[in-house]
């Protein structure tokens, strides 16, 4: 059996946590920030966990994580 390839884009976007979940950076914090409220930008700053519905897709993309 050949090795399963890791999706490199996913490897750069997701980090595995100690309990087996995955964390990711929020979207909407790259450009056009002047019209966004400070509160909105502040809440987008911390990392978020991948939701249960998307977890299977992320695990499939990162077989060795």
Curated annotation (Swiss-Prot):
Basic residues: compositionally biased ranges: 10-22
Stretches for region Disordered: 1-22
Keywords, ordered alphabetically: Ribonucleoprotein, Ribosomal protein
Gene Ontology biological process terms from the UniProt entry: cytoplasmic translation
Domain of life: Bacteria
Single GO MF descriptor: structural constituent of ribosome
Family annotation (PROSITE patterns): RIBOSOMAL_L35 (PS00936)
Pfam families per the UniProt record, alphabetical: Ribosomal_L35p
Similarity remark: Belongs to the bacterial ribosomal protein bL35 family.
Name of protein: Large ribosomal subunit protein bL35
